[in-house]
Curated annotation (Swiss-Prot):
Record protein name field: Large ribosomal subunit protein bL21
A GO cellular-component term linked to this record: ribosome
Keywords, ordered alphabetically: Ribonucleoprotein, Ribosomal protein, RNA-binding, rRNA-binding
A Pfam family hit: Ribosomal_L21p
One Gene Ontology term from the biological process aspect of the record: translation
GO molecular function: rRNA binding; structural constituent of ribosome
UniProt similarity note: Belongs to the bacterial ribosomal protein bL21 family.
Function per UniProt: This protein binds to 23S rRNA in the presence of protein L20.
Keyword Ribonucleoprotein: yes
Length: 102
């Protein structure tokens, strides 16, 4: 059984015991979080079930930052160069349970 969840403006296909990296959540390490925006579920024989009351429970493993992304702007012949960097805050989750409340 797997679920498709949405968090941080992105969609993730998850199963139980999966480890995913998502946009930062306000939760401390070891805390249980519930992701309630479930788009689709699969049941036995991989048929798709659409449920409104489904949720996914996960535990927070780590709060970290992603790799640095370099932003570089240049206008030729004008001596205009700008270099900037950005590191996005991330949360690492372990999916513990997929709740199907029909």
């Amino acid at each position: 059984m797997f679920a498709i969840i949405e968090t941080g403006g992105k969609q993730y296909k998850v199963k139980e015991h999966d480890i995913i990296r998502i946009e930062k959540l306000n939760a401390s390490v070891g805390e249980e979080v519930t992701l309630s925006k479930v788009i689709a579920l699969t049941g036995v024989d991989n048929e798709v079930i659409f449920t409104q009351n489904a949720s996914v429970t996960a535990s927070v493993l780590e709060q970290c930052r992603n790799d640095k992304v370099i932003i570089f702007k240049k206008k030729r012949r004008k001596n205009y160069r700008r270099k900037n960097g950005h590191r996005q805050y991330m949360t690492v989750l372990r999916i513990t349970k997929i709740n199907n409340m029909e």
